[in-house]
């Protein structure tokens, strides 16, 4: 709880500073407040305590499993379920980092660095602080959830960056990020097909039959994923 309060407080301070700069008409290329938020949140996420206390997992429900997978991924399948069900790109990414180091903090730094960067990039690109500082302040909650669902939040990060690429008409980058998100976690396919609808239906009318069909397809894809 103390960790979360510290993160929220630092987030509030940095957000207030950035919004004050925006209101004063200052648009700095290097946003110091974002940098402070990035590195503090990254440090707290990477070096948080992960373990068991009285049979209860501390530091995120999935965190011990991911650490175990990272440390044993080069040794063979073993008994770790992630060797069986994890998507190929996540396995490749994990093994690539493990080849360089056995320190899981480095692994976490890369993962949470991507997640935090995607949040800040998305908010900055769409000027979400222009009228309200609440969106960035509220990011502490999904970020904390990433402690328990690492792969899910990696895919969310890639999708957010893909939306930024879409806004800037960098379509090749957008598709690359969306495809990567599916090969990190297949359930993200339901979100990755968003640009197809965007490109097609910005010039075509959406009917009730089509909307119903897409909902059914989306539910099926989500269930399969």
What do these predicted ranges mean?
Residues 58-68, 91, 195-225:
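Alpha-helical transmembrane segments and terminal signal-anchor/GPI-anchor hydrophobic tails
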